[in-house]
UniProtKB/Swiss-Prot annotation:
Keyword Cytoplasm included in the entry's annotation: yes
Family according to the record: Belongs to the transaldolase family. Type 3B subfamily.
UniProt xrefs under HAMAP family: Transaldolase_3b
Subcellular localization, as worded in the UniProt entry: Cytoplasm
Gene of this entry: tal
Function (record text): Transaldolase is important for the balance of metabolites in the pentose-phosphate pathway.
Stored InterPro entries: Aldolase_TIM, TAL/FSA, Transaldolase_3B, Transaldolase_3B/F6P_aldolase, Transaldolase_AS, TSA/FSA_arc/bac
Main location: cytoplasm
MF-aspect GO terms: aldehyde-lyase activity; transaldolase activity
Name assigned to this protein: Probable transaldolase
Entry's Gene Ontology BP terms: carbohydrate metabolic process; pentose-phosphate shunt
Keyword terms: Cytoplasm, Pentose shunt, Schiff base, Transferase
Length: 217
């Protein structure tokens, strides 16, 4: 499963990328606001850090304006993925931009039917939001499973990009289900390496090693 990092923080992206943990990046208007930077400037910098897909989101609501913004964003770098909302206008823009050879990430997906429409419109990625469904006492991971089944049934090439990942358990669940990609904030990715028994075991090893009085270097 590919790891995308969900942030516009270039330092955090670079640190994870140096570890080989970043296959791509996703951004949205909220993350651009949090960065306090110009969207074109920060997106261009991100595209220079990672070689994989970098999702940059349009802010228009009508198809023609979405298409124009998508073309503008795609000029930033070859690895730009134009991010579009899952609306009829977004699907129309998806069809046009994908026909032009541009990568498209259709976002804000909350149902398998929506994911089916995005695949038929030629989306490169579909982004189902797990955490927001969980907030409504629904099973976000069940949605990932349903989309996986539909895409496999009909041979769609659209990649499932599990989004709104909030916990390490979410990461494990979507990996078991078979999501192609997951995108998560840097802090969630950092937590994947943590386990209390690892810490406890390391502490015991260090204590015992100190008692030997030996050194390696």
């Amino acid at each position: 499963m590919k790891f995308f990092v969900d942030t516009a923080d270039t330092q955090a992206i670079a640190e994870l990328n140096d570890l080989g943990m970043v296959d791509g990046v996703t951004t949205n208007p909220s993350l651009i606001l949090k960065s306090g930077r110009d969207i074109i400037e920060v997106t261009k910098e991100i595209c220079g850090i990672v070689s994989g897909p970098v999702s940059a989101e349009v802010v228009a609501l009508e198809a023609e304006a979405m298409i124009a913004e998508g073309r503008k964003l795609a000029e930033i770098a070859e690895n730009i993925t134009v991010k579009l909302p899952l609306t009829w206008d977004g699907l129309k823009a998806c069809k046009t931009l994908s026909d032009e050879g541009k990568m498209v990430n259709v976002t804000l997906c909350f149902s398998a039917n929506q994911a089916l429409l995005a695949a038929k419109a030629g989306a490169s990625f579909i982004s189902p939001f797990i955490g927001r469904l969980d907030d409504m006492s629904l099973d976000g991971c069940e949605l990932i499973e349903d989309i996986r089944t539909i895409y496999d049934n009909y041979g769609f090439g659209t990649e499932i990009l599990a989004a709104s990942i909030r916990t390490v358990n979410h990461v494990q669940q979507v990996a078991l289900i078979g999501a192609d990609v997951m995108t998560a904030p840097p802090e969630v990715i950092q937590k994947l390496a943590s386990h209390p028994l690892t810490d406890k075991g390391l502490q015991q090893f260090m204590s015992d090693w100190e008692k030997t009085g030996q050194k390696i270097l």
